[in-house]
Amino acid sequence: MKRIVVTGLGVVSSIGNNVAEVTQSLKQGKSGIEAVPQYKELGFRSQVAGTLKLNVDELVDRRLRRFMGDGAAYAYLAMKEAIADAGLSDTEVSNDRTGVVAGSGGPTTGAIVQAALITKEKGPKKVGPFMVPRAMSSTVSANLATAYKIKGLSYSISSACSTSAHCIGNAVETIQLGKADRMFAGGGEELDWTLSVLFDAMGAMSSKYNDTPQKASRAYDKDRDGFEIGRAHV
């Protein structure tokens, strides 16, 4: 069996905007869960989430940004870090033997709701041509392939919270099968109330720790009462 190794990492998350920051936060046991006032105003049971302190509009060229929802923009920044970490040249990135498999747990619900509201208030012609690459379930891989001129395999896997793990595993198998020499793999999610409300309605998210959000994430604790939604890309 062909041995596969990880040569570069890139992360944008609630505990850091790059690998170094995330590593430090993990060593310090830092929580990225915070109170979200909007969720309280909307009447959500769960009023906490993993938020980001990052202005993607300042970091992504607007010509690329117009095609991206926030999740795809996070992915773009994480991939930029991974490329630098791996020391890949432009020709190695944009190469027939280089591919990308990266996804998200669902579509960009905020963009879908926005398009619906625009259609209702102003008509369908006002929706604009950039909403599809922002909203579709394959927005992450599509935007990465376009921005970095990926010439090899490019697609998304969507499998809820397992999306990133499945994408990474699929990338490993792709290289083992000889279909590619290099693969970018991972997953990303943006945070928007239009998606959060679905999980809140299910009662799947933590609501006991709204006043102490840093204590909400307790995956293996007997007192856990649900997960915390968040935005990130790895």
Regions found by a protein language model. Give the residues of each.
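Generic hydrophobic secondary-structure packing signal
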Residues: 21, 25, 71-78, 137, ...
